[in-house]
Amino acid sequence: MNFKYIVAVSFLIASAYARSVQNDEQSLSQRDVLEEESLREIRSIGAKILGGVKTFFKGALKELASTYLQQKRTAEEQHEVMKRLEAVMRDLDSLDHPEEASERETRGFNQEEIANLFTKKEKRILGPVISKIGGVLGGLLKNLG
């Protein structure tokens, strides 16, 4: 009789332990699902913000380029400005698909060039933008003064 009770109690303990392990696994999987959903929400918010910033910069760059080109410039200067604007637009478009852009840009490069690629890209984006903004602000100050 005692043996039956020991087996029954052991069986109850084992089944309770199995249920607690199963509940722990379910709560962990639910937590993982919630974390994944929150990460998706954060990514979508980040993508929307990035899209808005990208749209703003594209519009601002086009406006700056049209203002700059309407001033009296030589054809060579206008061509150079348009080339820079196209490069900046390509860089902004590559923000949507960074893996594809980096694959295209790094084909045939050696390791040193790959290491310096990001600093060159930052300079290529920021250099023309800052110079254009400075030029426009300088022109506005001259017109106001």
Curated annotation (Swiss-Prot):
Listed GO biological process terms: defense response to bacterium; defense response to fungus; killing of cells of another organism
Tissues expressing this chain: Expressed by the skin glands.
Listed InterPro entries: Bombinin
Lineage top rank: taxon: Eukaryota
UniProt-annotated location(s): Secreted
Keywords: Amidation, Amphibian defense peptide, Antibiotic, Antimicrobial, Cleavage on pair of basic residues, Cytolysis, Fungicide, Hemolysis, Secreted, Signal
Propeptide: 19-43, 74-124
Function, in words: Maximin-5 shows antibacterial activity against both Gram-positive and Gram-negative bacteria. The only exception is the resistance of E.coli. Also shows antimicrobial activity against fungi C.albicans, A.flavus and P.uticale. It has little hemolytic activity. It does not possess a significant cytotoxicity against tumor cell lines. It does not possess a significant anti-HIV activity.
Protein name (database record): Maximins 5/H4 type 2
Organism expressing this protein natively: Bombina maxima (Giant fire-bellied toad)
Record lineage: Eukaryota, Metazoa, Chordata, Craniata, Vertebrata
